[in-house]
Amino acid sequence: MKRARNLLVLLLLAASAAWAVPEVDQPAPALKGVLFSGEPFDLAQMRGKVVLVNFYSSYCKHCAYEIGNLETFYEGHRDQGFEVLVVGVDALADRHRVERMVGLYGLQGVMADDLAESGFERSYPTPTAFVIDRDGVLRSKTRGSKTPQYFTEYVLPLLTK
């Protein structure tokens, strides 16, 4: 009985580590998968760029509001090494809704259920964004819509370093 209990505790600890919440000023967790475009991606391979990972739902009114702001900032700063990755948290049956919205705004995206590897927790309110600096360190975690002021405060300083 004691052995089974110890095994259960070890399994719970391992599971909680796998779904740990990423912490600011710590290395960004792993994130790998295949984009809607069919291209593979690996967040670790994006070192040298500032990356905004945005958890998104096609049913979220705040997500719909902010996606135009994401596109505008991305278009104005991608030449400085800025990338946006939209992670759709909708059910796979709604993949077409997320893919259409992401494509309409010229961003790259993936469905959370299609990820090959993710160290990000799967239960974020949408939208939730993580900004990762050029060294692969998580610099901010923000819930709610991203406004132009958000980009000026949290992303622009990382691009000008």
Question: Across the structure, where does each feature detected by a protein language model lie?
Answer:
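Positively charged n-region of N-terminal signal peptides that target proteins for export
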Residues: 1-6
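Bacterial N-terminal signal peptides
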Residues: 7-16
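N-terminal "domain-start" segment that seeds a small globular fold
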Residues: 19-43, 109
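Short active-site neighborhood of thiol/selenol oxidoreductases, capturing the structured segment around
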Residues: 43-61
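Active-site acidic short loop of glycosyltransferases
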Residues: 47-49, 79, 107
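Hydrophobic beta-strand anchors of alpha/beta hydrolase catalytic cores
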Residues: 52-53, 84, 129
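Structural microenvironment flanking redox-active thiols in thiol-disulfide oxidoreductases
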Residues: 64-104, 114-118
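Thiol/disulfide oxidoreductase modules built on the thioredoxin-like
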Residues: 101-107, 113-156
